Every structure is written in structure tokens, then in C-alpha cells.
């Protein structure tokens, strides 16, 4: 997404369906910081923070598996990395790479998250309707999985590079305007990311506000690199 992230001796490595997965240690730190408000709540505490981290890890892994498995289906061996900005499924497009396949791979991540959302909410309400009394931590895990996969799935479809919505926007723009489609995708990304950053900051949602502020700046930098100068 933003260049290669150097491996460390503390990386967690494993594979899923033959797809290599690497988890950078900063992934855990950022996930913990995002859920640190649980520590200030006397009714919650450390166990609920661990539930949050586990739900973030599982949700992002499923999301990236959506991308990776689709790329693998088309014959392009993928690998997954989870790091401080979330996750990324990497692969080298080969013969047969088309705009429609690019869009399909980009959408497969959010689609996997939405499918997980559907399974989790169906299981959660099914258990409750059956009269099953869930342990508070289990109930909290269901709640967090629903929240993460719905909200992150929707946010990730915003047309801001390098989010999946930005990739889809870029594919559409370059298909319609081969000469300057990347520039139009970056223009759209700057405007949307800037607006979303201001919205989150106005709601005192600092982490997503700063994240989209960073994405706005990143799109601006890429735009300048394409143009050679900052003019529109």
C-alpha cells in the first residue's frame, strides 16, 4: 500500500489455504491503542481489550483473504501482511489481468467482511432467540465483530486510494480515461479523504480523523508525483 514494510524478528508468520501471512508487531500495538478506552471503563478492563484485538485481527484477516483468494483463483500467488495501517494482500498480476478482474479483486475484501458480518449477526441473534445466555465476553465479541465488519466494510469502499473503494475508482477512471485516469482517481481521493477527515475530527473521532487526513496527504503527494508539480 505505502511501500514494503521491512520484516522484523518479532513478526508472526503462518499460512491460510496455502497463502503466507505476516503480522508486523505494530499491528497489535495500533489495535490495542484503538481499543484502549476499554481500560478506562471499570466495567470492562483488559479482557475486553484482548477481545477487541482478537476481533480486529480476525476481521482484517478475513478481509484480506477475500482479496488473496480471488487473486489466487485467477492464478496469481498472493501473500498477506497485517501492519500498522491495517492489512494488504499483495500479488503480481499476470496474464489475463483486466479492469473487471481488478475491480473484482478489490471488492472481494469488503464482500468477505460483509459475509462475515451476516454470519456473525445471524449466529448472535439465533443464539439469543434460542434462549442461550452468552458469557459477557462472548456477547461483546459478537458485538465487536458486527461493528467492525459493517463499519470498516463501508468505510473501506470510499473512493480513496489505497482503500478498496479507491482501487475500484482508479480502475474505473483509467478505463474511461486511459491518459489521465490515475490523476482523476487521486483528485477524487483527496476531496473525499479531506472531507471524511474533517467529519471524523468534528465528531472527536481522532484516530479515523488522522487516518483520513494522512490518506488525503498521501493522495496529494501521489498527485504531485504524477503531475510533476502541485497544480490542478
Locate predicted features.
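Hydrophobic transmembrane alpha-helices and their immediate loop junctions
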Residues: 1-232
Amino acid at each position: 500500500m505505502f511501500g514494503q514494510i521491512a520484516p522484523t524478528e518479532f513478526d508472526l508468520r503462518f499460512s491460510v489455504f496455502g497463502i503466507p501471512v505476516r503480522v508486523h508487531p505494530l499491528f497489535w500495538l495500533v489495535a490495542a491503542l484503538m481499543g484502549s478506552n476499554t481500560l478506562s471503563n471499570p466495567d470492562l478492563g483488559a479482557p475486553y481489550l484482548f477481545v477487541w484485538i482478537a476481533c480486529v485481527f480476525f476481521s482484517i484477516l478475513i478481509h484480506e483473504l477475500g482479496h488473496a483468494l480471488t487473486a489466487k483463483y485467477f492464478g496469481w500467488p498472493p501473500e498477506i501482511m497485517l501492519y500498522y495501517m491495517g492489512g494488504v494482500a499483495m500479488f503480481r498480476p499476470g496474464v489475463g489481468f483486466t479492469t473487471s478482474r481488478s475491480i473484482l479483486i478489490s471488492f472481494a475484501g469488503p464482500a468477505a467482511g460483509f459475509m462475515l458480518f451476516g454470519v456473525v449477526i445471524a449466529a448472535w441473534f439465533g443464539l439469543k432467540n434460542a434462549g442461550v445466555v452468552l458469557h459477557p465476553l462472548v456477547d461483546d465479541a459478537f458485538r465487536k465483530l458486527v461493528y467492525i465488519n459493517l463499519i470498516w466494510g463501508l468505510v473501506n469502499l470510499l473512493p480513496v486510494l489505497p482503500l478498496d473503494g479507491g482501487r475500484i475508482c482508479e480502475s474505473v477512471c483509467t478505463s474511461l480515461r486511459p491518459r489521465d485516469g490515475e490523476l482523476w482517481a487521486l483528485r477524487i481521493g483527496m476531496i473525499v479523504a479531506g472531507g471524511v477527515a474533517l467529519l471524523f475530527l468534528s465528531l472527536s473521532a481522532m484516530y479515523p480523523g488522522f487516518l483520513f487526513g494522512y490518506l488525503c496527504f498521501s493522495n496529494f503527494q501521489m498527485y504531485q508525483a504524477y503531475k510533476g508539480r502541485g497544480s490542478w
